[in-house]
């Protein structure tokens, strides 16, 4: 990444491209007007019959969808290609083929249109997604990033100023949701199916463990909870009780255990850092139970919790366009010899001055 540009004095319009996994997201973010258009195509139906994302199919579908979605987004925003001043694209973490699908289009368009492009960390996009809302969190804050591939607690002092406080040692929370759904024979994607069934579950029938809350620190683990869930289900089936109500009760116990664990860890992080603002982002941040637990935590602390709107909890182009816009405004851009990173340390990102961010 290079930083030789000075901050532009005129308004900018950034095209954001997100293709890290199984959603193709395109958006336009204006430096003064904010988000002016976004489109999203989900590959859920494509992967449903396989019970999970097939990387090769995901890459091919991104290639088919990117250009039409860009055209649709430009039409929605009532702008033309010549109005775009920069392009932001997800360069990692994610599926390599999917990342390259978006990055190659982004770099090609930037070269053809003679405008800068910037590689964006997928999880930075999620972290900053609440900045798209009318009420934005002020720096510094603690952020819980919770998704299918990540569960991290981070101190955020500005864009690019990230300190990892806690991480999962094995499964991410979203991955545990998906695997629980598969154990119980629920549909795809699994997380929303578990949450839907949990609404009908009895709260007190099962008591699941809250992993790693009995020891100091902010790291997390969800593989043991997943195994406990499986054993509970197998015992129920052995006793002849494999009813939908039993499934619902197990889903409820599992969901509450995850929510409690995340709440306890966030409370510790806020106390440790002396902060009272909590940002919760990523696909799992849409979960009702998790939001309820964290809202209750912040209400008790007389603090504030911030979330993206539901449509921006999952992968989307808007969060990439926003993050890219802020970095491009700070004079950062990526050179033509781009590289995607299926694994990418969030703490390694270059910071921009928080004073420059509104």
UniProtKB/Swiss-Prot annotation:
The keyword Lipid biosynthesis does not apply. Fe cation binds at residues 122, 126, 315. GO terms for molecular function: iron ion binding; N(6)-L-threonylcarbamoyladenine synthase activity. GO terms for cellular component: cytoplasm. Its cofactor is Fe(2+). Binds 1 Fe(2+) ion per subunit. Substrate binds at residues 145-149, 178, 191, 287. It catalyses: L-threonylcarbamoyladenylate + adenosine(37) in tRNA = N(6)-L-threonylcarbamoyladenosine(37) in tRNA + AMP + H(+). PANTHER family: TRNA N6-ADENOSINE THREONYLCARBAMOYLTRANSFERASE, TRNA N6-ADENOSINE THREONYLCARBAMOYLTRANSFERASE, MITOCHONDRIAL. Belongs to the KAE1 / TsaD family. This is tRNA N6-adenosine threonylcarbamoyltransferase. It comes from Hydrogenovibrio crunogenus (strain DSM 25203 / XCL-2). The gene is tsaD.
């Amino acid at each position: 990444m290079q930083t030789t540009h000075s901050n532009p004095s005129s308004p900018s319009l950034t095209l954001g491209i997100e293709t890290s996994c199984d959603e193709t997201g395109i958006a336009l973010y204006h430096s003064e007007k904010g988000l002016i258009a976004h489109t999203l195509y989900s590959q859920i139906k494509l992967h449903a019959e396989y019970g999970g994302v097939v990387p090769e199919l995901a890459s091919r579908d991104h290639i088919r969808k990117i250009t039409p979605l860009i055209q649709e987004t430009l039409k929605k925003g009532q702008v033309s290609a010549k109005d775009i001043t920069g392009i932001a694209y997800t360069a990692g973490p994610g599926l390599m083929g999917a990342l390259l699908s978006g990055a190659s289009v982004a770099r090609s368009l930037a070269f053809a249109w003679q405008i800068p492009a910037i590689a964006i960390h997928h999880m930075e996009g999620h972290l900053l997604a609440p900045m798209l809302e009318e009420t934005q969190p002020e720096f510094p804050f603690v952020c819980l990033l919770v998704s299918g591939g990540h569960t991290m607690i981070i101190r955020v002092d500005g864009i690019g100023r990230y300190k990892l406080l806690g991480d999962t040692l094995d499964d991410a929370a979203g991955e545990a949701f998906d695997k629980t759904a598969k154990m119980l024979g629920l549909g795809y994607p699994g997380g929303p199916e578990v949450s839907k069934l949990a609404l009908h579950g009895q709260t007190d029938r099962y008591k699941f463990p809250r992993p790693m809350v009995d020891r100091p620190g902010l790291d997390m683990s969800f593989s043991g909870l997943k195994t406990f869930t499986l054993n509970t289900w197998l015992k129920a089936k052995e006793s002849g009780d494999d009813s939908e109500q039993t499934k619902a009760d197990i889903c409820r116990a599992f969901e509450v255990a995850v929510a409690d664990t995340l709440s306890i860890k966030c409370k510790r992080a806020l106390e440790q850092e002396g902060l009272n603002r909590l940002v919760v982002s990523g696909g799992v941040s849409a979960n009702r139970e998790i939001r309820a637990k964290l809202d209750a935590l912040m209400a008790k602390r007389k603090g504030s919790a911030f979330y993206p709107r539901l449509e921006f909890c999952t992968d989307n182009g808007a969060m990439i366009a926003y993050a890219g816009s802020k970095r491009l405004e700070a004079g950062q851009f990526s050179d033509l010899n781009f590289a995607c990173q299926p694994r990418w340390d969030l703490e390694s990102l270059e910071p921009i001055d928080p004073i420059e961010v509104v």
